[in-house]
């Protein structure tokens, strides 16, 4: 059975990422001219600090230099967090997005698209708060995971944090 370069890299790098209490979200190998590009996306419950990315990048670079996982040619290594508008693809992503606004593309004939705040997450699905339209109050909605085709966190520029709401 053949393994892809990404699978080999995942096996090699996952222990390094886990040792820093981070989750390995994605590995992407591509080309930029004559150089290879290795993009590694990591995350954690608390988010990822820039210093953690830099430290992990050094550890990964050392490990890759010890092996031939990236071949003999030159490559660029990029280690980063998933970003503010990350796609939600795993249960832990939804848990981390609790309290945030998300855009859901519904599966099948589920009426297309829904924007709602994630209030709670369990093994079967999500409890959501759908914002009211034209002065109406928000409504509660339950959404099962199998009803979701795609989901992504929405960036909110004018959201008050909890301290502001309590004041």
From Swiss-Prot:
Keywords in alphabetical order: Cytoplasm, Ribosome biogenesis
GO biological process terms held by the UniProt record: ribosomal small subunit assembly; translation
UniProt-listed InterPro entries: Ribosome_maturation_RimP (IPR003728), RimP_C (IPR028998), RimP_C_sf (IPR036847), RimP_N (IPR028989), RimP_N_sf (IPR035956)
Entry keyword annotation includes Cytoplasm: yes
Gene3D superfamilies: RimP-like superfamily, N-terminal
Highest taxon listed in the record's lineage: Bacteria
Compartments reported by the entry: Cytoplasm
SUPFAM superfamilies tied to this protein: YhbC-like, C-terminal domain, YhbC-like, N-terminal domain
Keyword Manganese: no
Cellular-component GO terms for this entry: cytosol
Known role: Required for maturation of 30S ribosomal subunits.
Annotated family: Belongs to the RimP family.
Name listed for the protein in its UniProt record: Ribosome maturation factor RimP
Organism this protein belongs to: Streptomyces griseus subsp. griseus (strain JCM 4626 / CBS 651.72 / NBRC 13350 / KCC S-0626 / ISP 5235)
């Amino acid at each position: 059975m053949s393994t892809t370069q990404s699978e080999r890299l995942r096996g090699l790098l996952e222990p390094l990422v886990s040792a820093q209490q981070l989750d390995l979200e994605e590995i992407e190998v591509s080309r930029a001219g004559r150089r290879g590009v290795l993009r590694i996306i990591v995350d954690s419950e608390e988010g990822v600090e820039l210093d953690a990315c830099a430290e992990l990048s050094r550890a990964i670079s050392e490990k890759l230099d010890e092996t031939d996982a990236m071949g003999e040619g030159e490559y660029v290594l990029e280690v980063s967090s998933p970003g503010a508008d990350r796609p939600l693809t795993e249960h832990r992503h939804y848990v981390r997005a609790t309290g945030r606004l998300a855009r859901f593309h519904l599966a099948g004939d589920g009426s297309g698209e829904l924007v709602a705040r994630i209030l709670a997450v369990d093994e079967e699905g999500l409890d959501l708060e759908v914002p009211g339209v034209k002065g109406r109050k928000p409504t509660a909605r339950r959404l099962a995971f199998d009803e979701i085709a795609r989901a992504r966190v929405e960036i909110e520029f004018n959201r008050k944090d909890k301290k502001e709401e309590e004041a």
